Amino acid sequence: KYSYRNPKNYIKFTPELFQQVAPVEIYRAEEKLLYRFIGKVPVFTYDNNKTLSLNSCNIVIPQIEGMHIKYILAVLNSSVAAFYINKKFHSVKLLRSHIESFPIPVISSEKQENIIKKVDCIINSNKNIYNLYTELDTDIMSLYKLSKNQIETIYNALSDKNLFLAAR
């Protein structure tokens, strides 16, 4: 989650030879989120390197006024999002409509900045980041004003899923 490893293999980008290709400007966007199309929980990563991806990894470029892309990244990678998407859609496929239906709390720029600092630490860290994941997940949970019982329900429902994929 949050970041991706540097690739070891490459495909020559010749879109005219490919079966299915998004417009080049989407791949080459200054900032975008890449997400795993198939999986038990949502897995989003931030890209500001104009990275190309295969079709098993979809692209979303959030344009929500007043919301920073890394704040949206944190919310979409949260246990709340995983729980919501699992319970509402009962699918291993993560569709754009699923993402668009997920409510993202409106918070101040200052609060977003605190979350973004943690996201940046996760993206840039090579060390064990489990504690950062947990801390960030707790921060996101608090935005939804969930009770202890609701939080416990979410964690119990996701207990068999790997929520903390290694970043590097």
Which role fits each region the language model picked out?
Residues 1-113:
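Polybasic, glycine- and aromatic-enriched phosphate-binding surface used to engage nucleic acids
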Residues 106-168:
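Non-catalytic DNA-recognition/assembly elements of restriction-modification systems
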